[in-house]
């Protein structure tokens, strides 16, 4: 499903938070949306592997990497695991690598930057906790919608089948 965050902002302005424009799209999907699972980890992606092995249907992994762009938290192997388990997307407050491979995957990926350096996979970090970046506080269970224009957050799923929506807003 495709989302237009500008249109969603116009319709649901009282019900959403808009994340500051810190992110670029690195995945093969230009837009994505779903319920978030939060992770906080700094320059270590071991916990991401554990979480992305779960069923990701209608889910987005939201990663607070402390804004570090010194080491990439997401690479092609990790993103491929997300695709295999049907995740909608990954948002990284940090960096990714292997961007050419990421752009070929049927997965939404937004991050701050790309860098070739990888990180260890020791499993250090926490999941399902409150995280804050980009002027927004995220909780596991919130709903996130992203496209090339930006990222928005809602406590509840947006009524995407409402008659209010433009016909081009959603495409299968």
UniProtKB/Swiss-Prot annotation:
Alphabetized UniProt keyword annotations: Cytoplasm
GO CC list: cytosol
PANTHER family reported in the protein's UniProt record: 4-HYDROXY-4-METHYL-2-OXOGLUTARATE ALDOLASE 3-RELATED, REGULATOR OF RIBONUCLEASE ACTIVITY A
Subcellular location: Cytoplasm
InterPro entries: RraA (IPR010203), RraA/RraA-like (IPR005493), RraA/RraA-like_sf (IPR036704), RraA_gpbac (IPR014339)
One term of GO molecular function: enzyme binding
Gene3D superfamilies per record: Ribonuclease E inhibitor RraA/RraA-like
Subunit structure: Homotrimer. Binds to both RNA-binding sites in the C-terminal region of Rne and to RhlB.
Alphabetized NCBIfam families for the sequence: NOT-MenG (TIGR01935), PRK09372.1 (NF006875), RraA_entero (TIGR02998)
Taxonomic lineage from the root: Bacteria, Pseudomonadati, Pseudomonadota, Gammaproteobacteria, Enterobacterales
Example of a GO biological process term: negative regulation of RNA catabolic process
Cytoplasm listed as a keyword: yes
Function of the molecule: Globally modulates RNA abundance by binding to RNase E (Rne) and regulating its endonucleolytic activity. Can modulate Rne action in a substrate-dependent manner by altering the composition of the degradosome. Modulates RNA-binding and helicase activities of the degradosome.
Pfam families per record: RraA-like (PF03737)
Protein name: Regulator of ribonuclease activity A
Keyword hit for Metal-binding: no
Protein family per UniProt: Belongs to the RraA family.
Stored SUPFAM superfamilies: RraA-like (SSF89562)
């Amino acid at each position: 499903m495709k989302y237009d965050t500008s249109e969603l902002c116009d319709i649901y302005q009282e019900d959403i938070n808009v994340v500051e424009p810190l992110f670029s799209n690195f995945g093969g999907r230009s837009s994505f949306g779903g319920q978030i699972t939060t992770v906080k980890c700094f320059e270590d992606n071991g916990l991401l592997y554990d979480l992305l092995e779960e069923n990701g249907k209608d889910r987005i992994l939201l990663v607070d990497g402390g804004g570090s762009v010194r080491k990439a938290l997401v690479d092609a192997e990790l993103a491929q695991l997300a695709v295999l388990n049907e995740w909608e997307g990954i948002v990284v407050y940090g960096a990714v690598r292997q961007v050419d491979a990421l752009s070929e995957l049927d997965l939404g990926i937004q991050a701050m930057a790309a860098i070739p350096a990888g990180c260890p996979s020791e499993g250090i970090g926490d999941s399902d906790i409150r995280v804050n970046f980009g002027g927004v506080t995220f909780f596991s269970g919130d709903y996130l919608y992203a496209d090339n224009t930006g990222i928005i957050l809602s406590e509840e799923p947006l009524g995407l089948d409402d008659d209010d929506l433009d016909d081009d807003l959603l495409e299968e």
